[in-house]
Swiss-Prot record:
Name under which the protein is recorded: Coiled-coil domain-containing protein 78
Its biological purpose: Component of the deuterosome, a structure that promotes de novo centriole amplification in multiciliated cells that can generate more than 100 centrioles. Deuterosome-mediated centriole amplification occurs in terminally differentiated multiciliated cells (G1/0) and not in S phase. Essential for centriole amplification and is required for cep152 localization to the deuterosome.
Keyword Iron-sulfur applies: no
A single cellular component GO annotation: cytoplasm
Tissue expression per record: Restricted to multiciliated cells.
Coiled-coil zones: 9-327, 419-541
Induction context: Highly up-regulated in the ciliated epithelia of embryonic skin during the developmental window of centriole biogenesis. Expression is probably activated by mcidas/mcin.
Compositional bias segments (type: Basic and acidic residues): 1-19
Subcellular location: Cytoplasm, Cytoskeleton, Microtubule organizing center, Centrosome, Centriole
Source organism of the structure: Xenopus laevis
GO terms (BP aspect): cell projection organization; de novo centriole assembly involved in multi-ciliated epithelial cell differentiation
Amino acid sequence: MDSTEDRETPLKDQIRRLTNENVQLQDRNERLYAKLGELQDKMGKLAGSKTDLSSKLVLSEEEKLKISKELIELQIETNKIREHYEAETFELKNTILTLENRLMSLELQKEKLAGEHESVKERLQAVDANRKELADEYIVLKSNYLALSKEHEKEVAKNDELSMELLNLASRRGQDETYSQSRALVNEATAELDRVKAMVNRLSARNIKPEDLVATEYERQKLERNLLGNQDHIREEIENMKKIHETQQQRLEERIIAMGKELQEAKRAIRNTQHKMAEQSAVLLTSQSQLQETEAQNSHLQLQLKELNEEYRSRLNRYIQDLADYVDGTARSKGDGTRMKHFVDNMLSDIKASHRSREEQLAGAARQYKKRMQNLIKKHQSLLIAYRMQREQLLASGNQDVEPGPPEHHFTITDPELQSQVGLELNRLREDKARLETQIHDLKEKKRLSDAGTSNQHVEHGGKLQEESWAEIRKQLREFTHNTQEELERERSQLLSRALVAEEQVAELQDYVDKHLARYKQEILRLRKLLGNEEQRAVSADAPQSLLIRALRRNSHEM
């Protein structure tokens, strides 16, 4: 009995030890099952959070793509509206300039016809004055002729009476009284001779010769015929000039009425275009407000995406560290406790290195862009200097046929972010210089107009100076139209270049959107596949350790 009891005691001790070890193993197994349940819960939560994050990322990417497409469409519409508006303004400016040129030409023709009318009026007044003077002279000559004819008739009657008296005396007296008769006749003849001499002296005092008395009647008739003929000819010329003036005045009035109608139509078209421009500006303002709202939403979504990425990265790092600790804890009994920890550390260092390289790449691109902008600004400054020197040379030469161009202030960069303090000060000095040049040009124009006014006063006294002034005015009008056409052509070329640049930008953005859209679609499909695989792994509780390590390695490469 003692021997059997001695044999049973070590067996009982061994059974007790085995039961204790079994209890310890059961406790350890329960703890491991609890840890496994916790890890499965964590993996389920990780898969759920990953699906949520992936869905949020997909939605945010889709929203970003939609917003970018809408922005591109808005930019295209605004560019089209701007091009249409600029084309309409260009056409309206051309029509206004042509109408103004036609109106100025009509005004010049009207002024010319008014000057001709004034000259014809002055000539008519001079002809009327000459006619009145000739009529007065004719009346004076006629009165003198009548007085002389009356005196001549009286003298003829007296001579007849004397001759009759002499004949009577000769018939009544005889030959014996010849001496007394001859003496009386001599006395009468001397008296008659004295009377004739007195009459001749009186006629010579009036500057009329006796032999001219016979031709006065013929000259009077000839003068009357000439005066009447000149009056008829002058009257015909006056009637013809009146008819020509009336026809020209009627033509000018018709052309002015037509020009007024065209001007009203142009004003109506301008009002319509202004109304359209107001509507388009309202649409543009609304689109700009929508663009600002979308930009704000985009920035907000980008911030949310950045926060989610950071949260996802931190949670992934924490989960990887937990998994590494768990794997190291389970593998510590096998003598390989630092392998998983080392792998996870290497993976995190690779992720940090990739982020650091991306940041360095972006910083290098920003530096390169800044360097390119500085080079462009330097080239622009050198071009401005060359343009200023060439313009000053043209202004110093004094050649009026060559247009020196606008001041250099029109070609300066107005963006303050691209300019330094020295550049801003130079721009301010260029503005002051341009303002002073415009003031000098205005003063020269005023002086030229005053000189032209004084010259116009002198032109009224001479036709040659008037023609020169008209030629100068036509030359100035041609220069004005030429300058306006050059400005419009320059503006048109600038608009075309801007349109080409905008088209290139739209094409680049479209290519960028297409490429990234395809890449995002591929990434979304890949993430969905990965999410499906991760869910299957989370459901299977007896997954081997090699598959877990491969999944972690794949996730590290994806990050």
